[in-house]
Amino acid sequence: MDAQVCSSLKIFRKMVKPKTEEEIELLRENAIIVSKTLAEVGKIVAPGVTTLELNRVAETFIRDNGAIPSFLGYEGFPAALCLSVNDVVVHGFPSNYVLKEGD
């Protein structure tokens, strides 16, 4: 099979569409909620806390702020947060795993 080298710029131009002012404002509002959610979860990250508890805090905060967790239910994903601890590469599920010092 022969590979062809091409500029990724052509591909990205097809994928990325300019946003309207309204879309930009929605993105800004969502980014603020995400930032505040991470800060809220960050308050309780400590040894002895489970990743399920981190998820509960995040989901509650998101919903209390009038938003919907985007990962929850997407392609069957069971949680509001993707939590990858230690050797979990990406998109880890929250569980009864108890955080330890150094995680």
Model-derived features: positions:
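Active-site neighborhoods and metal-handling regions in enzymes and metal-associated proteins
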Residues: 4, 8-103
